[in-house]
């Protein structure tokens, strides 16, 4: 029996971009940046396998997709920002306070020897349960040629800290976790633009097993779908499904890890079983990026991000974070939060202001600044590129409804606990000049 829930056309018709309870705050054009030498976007906090943000020896730690600026004068920032995915790597930051004002850039997380493909895309950084300092970076190994390749993968290392900061060792190799199989989700043979990325790995409290949710597409040839009554939902009388709806085929996939594999640190392909998607958006949208779960008050909240530009069939919705809730465990059924699925969208006057929202177990939401309108008399369409973290906001979760409740500092994070480890400072390794060149 299928456990897949649907985000329907009727659900999406309920989206209200003018609702202040589901709208991100406006971003000032004079926003601060974290570091002028790098540009960052998708970001996540160091967490445990249960989804809680944790500190390590008193330090807050986050990872970010990043590129080094080529021109520090910002003369070419538009081109550099718009092509950033072609140079993306995973970097990290550390802070004593987590208040957003004192993030220190730590540099590259994975060694280049770990790269199975040229680009490192989004995922999750997770402390290994029952270890002192082992940490797994689940991420997307991506290449555009000779065909679109996007494979959830993992690299493992160790975290260290002293009075002055945080550093990592290891992360020298990567292991592929699973690939789009054309059965549970579309692969490159079915859809040359297929999405298969952003692994979020966690332990389900209900059965104690380790799962990964990820972005995918409904299996089948691109554009060759029939949008039937199940995909339409309870549409109003006379409503006609718009042209191109069959090109919206997003799915939130799920895979389960074999028992005992997590404890052994074995995340190889043979240890994962891909299951039917948790949610599909056939006829609605073609992207459900960075899916992640929150277990709260006996419910399972499933969040994802999407773009205005990936809606299909004439449907309209903002760039932002969307969500679904289940009262009956991880496998649902799920219903869209706020009836429509929209949790937080950009203000209509700043439609591209923020993106890649991530919701933590206490409802704090981090995102990055994308494009902020900054019109001048000479150029009314001028804008400022962000490439830094947006103000953190908080949402209240009340059953199947959400409400924007608080706005915090730029780049602020909140830990739900401290990783259980000897607080004594670690001894820094002595790195020779030749070793540093190899690492770089």
Regions found by a protein language model. Name each.
Residues 1-440:
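Carbohydrate-active catalytic/glycan-binding domains of CAZyme proteins
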